[in-house]
């Protein structure tokens, strides 16, 4: 399919992950000389006119893609999503209380980090069934004085996704969208904060994008909050308070343009749904491989599956790699297999995976 990978190795890594071939080729062409500047973006001053154009254009393009309202700031930051686990309570815990919905390891880590700074209340959890579903969030017992409600919208390890946002009862919603960023349309106005590491669906590791409603960016932060973790510091400096991850942002900008070229977020959603259906349909009829997530909560991005036999799982991963299907081993905390099928994964990659799974099943029945 035009715009996607054309070689025979398919990378199903959960992140850092597959990038569009077109983007990689453009970056290679510009590696030694970016648009006649005589230098690589890697060498370029972040205060230069050329780089100023790169970061401003990247912001414009993500605003266009997500239809981000004018009263939201877009920040290109460092420290990954994990650093935002601390930045969120530091910037938002006015009453030193927040509600967390625990649907996997990353939501749990964010919840544990927030407990350092105030009272983090777990208002729902799917830990009772190994995070294999999304709990009902239509009528949560949210403390009246909670400053925000926090979710990890797509759970990379366990393969679940919020299909409907929780009823926050008027509280600001904060969402870690690291593994579903730009995979489908989103109504930004329903969130107070959206953030995510880019290394799954948007670019190379080293950049986190935070989209924050302006009224939440204030000087009123927890005492002792480091200057670099104050959103106001970064917002006032347009993400240039210190040297940003210049090259990573440059690649993100190219991915934004690629998504636009492919038809925007509606087209990405259709593409991702088609890929996921191919894989889930096979899992639902297979006698050997089983999905681990309740069907209504299945992620379009991360698909975990097992054979039920650890030795057979290991054999599958080894033979899949030899067949050009890379990085299918499940997360170290859960085992089994996981296929991450982000935006840049072509349909052909999923078709080849299913073809191999059928062959493996026949040979190992």
What function would you assign to each model-found segment?
Residues 20, 198-280, 294, 363-365:
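Active-site C-terminal subdomain of aminotransferase-like
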Residues 8-59:
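A glycine-/small-polar-enriched, mobile loop at the entrance of the PLP active site in fold-type I
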Residues 289-320:
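Conserved PLP-binding catalytic core of the aspartate aminotransferase-like
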Residues 3-9, 322, 335-365:
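PLP-dependent enzyme catalytic core of the Aspartate aminotransferase-like
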Residues 39-84, 91, 105, 113:
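Conserved N-terminal alpha-helix of the aminotransferase class I/II PLP-enzyme fold
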Residues 82-149:
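PLP-dependent aminotransferase-like
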């Amino acid at each position: 399919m035009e715009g996607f990978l054309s070689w025979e190795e398919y990378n199903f890594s959960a992140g850092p992950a597959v990038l569009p071939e077109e983007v990689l080729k453009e970056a290679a062409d510009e590696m030694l000389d970016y648009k006649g500047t005589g230098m690589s973006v890697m060498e370029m001053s972040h205060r230069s006119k050329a780089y100023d154009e790169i970061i401003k254009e990247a912001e414009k393009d993500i605003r266009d893609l997500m239809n981000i309202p004018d009263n939201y700031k877009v920040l290109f930051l460092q420290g990954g999503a994990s650093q935002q686990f601390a930045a969120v309570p530091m910037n938002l815990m006015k009453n030193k209380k927040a509600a967390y919905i625990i649907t996997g390891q990353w939501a749990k880590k964010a919840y544990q980090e927030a407990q350092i700074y105030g009272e983090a209340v777990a208002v729902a959890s799917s830990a009772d069934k190994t995070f294999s579903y999304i709990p009902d969030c239509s009528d949560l017992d949210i403390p009246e004085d909670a400053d925000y409600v926090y979710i990890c919208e797509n759970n990379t390890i366990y393969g679940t996704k919020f299909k409907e946002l929780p009823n926050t009862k008027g509280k600001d919603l904060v969402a870690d969208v690291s593994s579903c960023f730009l995979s489908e349309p989103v109504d930004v106005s329903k969130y107070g904060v959206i953030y995510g590491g880019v290394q799954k669906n948007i670019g190379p590791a080293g950049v986190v994008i935070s989209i924050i409603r302006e009224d939440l960016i204030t000087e009123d932060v927890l005492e002792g909050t480091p200057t670099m973790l104050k959103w106001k510091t970064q917002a006032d400096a347009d993400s240039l308070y210190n040297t940003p991850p210049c090259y990573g942002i440059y690649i993100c900008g190219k991915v934004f343009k690629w998504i636009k070229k492919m038809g925007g977020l509606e087209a990405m959603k259709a593409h991702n749904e088609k890929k996921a259906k191919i894989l889930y349909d096979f899992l639902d009829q297979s006698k050997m491989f089983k999905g681990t997530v309740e069907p209504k909560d299945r992620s379009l991005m991360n698909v975990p599956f097992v054979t039920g036999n650890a030795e057979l799982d290991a054999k599958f991963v080894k033979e899949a790699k030899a067949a050009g299907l890379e990085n299918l081993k499940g997360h170290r905390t859960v085992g089994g297999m996981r296929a991450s099928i982000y935006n840049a994964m072509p349909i052909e990659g999923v078709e080849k995976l299913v073809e191999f799974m059928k062959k493996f099943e026949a040979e190992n029945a």
